[in-house]
Amino acid sequence: HPFLPYERNVTTAEINLGRYFGYNHKARVGFEWEKKTFSNDEDTLEYYYIAPQGSYIYDTRDIYRDPSKGILIVQGFYSHVEFDSDKQNLWWSQSYSFYHSLVKRKRKLTAAFNVSYLTAFGDVDEVWVSWLGGVKTVRGWSIPNSTIYTNVDNAYRFGNHFAIISTELRQTIIPTSVFTTDLFNWKQEYGLSAIAFVDVGFINRERKKLFGELPMAGIGFGFRIPAPMIGTIGLDYGWGYRSSSGYPVLGAGKSRC
């Protein structure tokens, strides 16, 4: 576990089915069967559950020729139905992204804006608590460790509900191109983009108090290289701020928008 004093062991099986409805709509539904054990020298927590899950995506971008303009909306749910207890949990995630080309030349300048929201329903145990920090939430902040978690002054970084607002500027430096390698005639991509980002996030254990605390903010820059199958790889350097305090963090790059 990233910050609790447990070693995690997972046994899992997963089935998902999905399809496109036209060019812009995609739906997926499925479930996981999982057994997770969190253990240390003094205690063992065991969870045995089935996890129904699904998502719906609406995407107006031309992701193959021009993904720099359009709208991307993602709705998703993930739940736990435990076999050994009456506990049932549900997480509902929402993401709304907007893209616009400010400069439409070959080396484009694109603005992107995203609003994300996650909320949980049910009796959520501490091993499932969410956090802010890292490339998937608020960049410029590290993923919390046990030292951060046990310090009561850092309680603002953990919760069951969060909202994140992100803005990015993306400048194409080397336009993406495709070439064929000599080995098995595989096709590869190359290109390079630079980004600047600002993230602002709120998190709380109570939904009604979500926006009652000072937000966590991150600002920084990074680089992106296209990679087949996984989209892009990159590197970010960001500064995290809350109130008047701030510190720099270097991390693997991943766009939130």
What do the PLM-derived regions correspond to, one by one?
Residues H1, V29-K35, I71-S79, Q94, ...:
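Transmembrane beta-barrel strands of outer-membrane/channel proteins
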